[in-house]
Every structure is written in C-alpha cells, then in structure tokens.
A protein has these predicted regions:
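Short amphipathic alpha-helical segments
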Residues: 102, 130-131
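Small-aliphatic-rich amphipathic alpha-helix that forms the alpha element of a beta-alpha
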Residues: 74-75, 117, 131-160
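N-terminal amphipathic, basic helical "cap/leader" segment at the start of enzyme domains
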Residues: 2-115, 121-122
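Short acidic/His/Gly/Ser-rich catalytic and metal-binding motifs that mark active-site loops
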Residues: 125-128
Length: 160
C-alpha cells in the first residue's frame, strides 16, 4: 500500500471519528436543553387521549391503596352547588363480582376483574337551596371520568 492511500485511509478514519464525536455532542446538548419532565398540560392531554375502555383484564391484583386513590380522584370531581351526590361502592370480592357479572348483562367483564368501583347517584341529596339535586347524573359522570383518568394514569384498565 502506498503512502498516499494510507494517508487517505487515515484521513477518512479521523473524519469519521470527528463526525461521530460531533453527532454525540449535538445529541448530548439537545438532551441537556430539553426539560426532564413534560409540562403538566402535555401530560394531562396525553392521559386524556390515551384513555380507552378496557373490558378484558389481567389477574394482576389491585391494592387497597390503588382503590383508595381511584375513589379520591373521583371525589375530587366538581359538582353543582357542591352537593357531591354520589356513593362509591368498592367491590374486591371475586364471588360478589362473579354474581354481579351473571346478573348484569352489560357487566360480564366483572367476572375477570380484580376489583370494581360502582359509582352510584344519591338522588336524595339536597342542594343548598333545600331542593333535590338536579345535576346528580352530571356530577356522577364527572366523578366517573376522574376515576377513569386516574386509572389510566396508574396503568389500570377500566371501563365506564
């Protein structure tokens, strides 16, 4: 191999090494200038857009702490005149869920679920003006959506 060819090969190897170093530097700087965490608004929107109804479940247990978190999220929903016309029934008894699945035609998925939370509207709750709450269905719907979004954020499958 002549000296001119050796020089070209060494120059090419050095150029490739320099290019690789520059690419690494640019990538490192780009990563350093990007925020470590996504803005809260982006995280919330991503959670809203990724939420979907899940009707087929794994056998992964759902802890009492997770169920409590879901109920807390539901209870944080807004309500008309702050009536909070809801009751939450947490069901984690497999036998009870299988019985409900057998009786409720649109809840067959309960037979496979590890737990369930029933959101019940309490129509006897009175508004501040002493009249029965007219918004109980809307209020319970908002609570249910909070619960579903929290389940999505926790990596749990859920359905309305």
């Amino acid at each position: 191999m002549n000296d001119a060819l050796k020089y070209k090969i060494v120059s090419l190897v050095l150029a490739i090494g320099l290019l690789a170093s520059l690419i690494h530097l640019v990538v490192s700087q780009k990563q350093a200038t990007q925020p470590e965490h996504k803005p809260a608004a982006e995280i919330v929107m991503q959670n809203i857009l990724s939420r979907k109804s899940v009707r087929s479940y794994t056998n992964r247990p759902v802890s009492r702490a997770q169920l409590d978190t879901l109920v807390r999220a539901a209870m944080a929903a807004p309500t008309g005149m702050d009536t909070r016309p809801w009751k939450f029934v947490v069901i984690d008894n497999k036998n009870a869920m299988q019985q409900l699945a057998a009786k409720l035609p649109r809840a067959k998925m309960l037979a496979e679920a590890q737990a369930a939370i029933a959101v019940c509207g309490d129509m006897s709750v009175l508004s501040k003006d002493g009249k029965p709450s007219r918004n109980w269905m809307l209020d319970c719907s908002a609570a249910t959506e909070n619960l579903l979004l929290q389940a999505e954020a926790m990596g749990l499958g859920a359905v309305w």
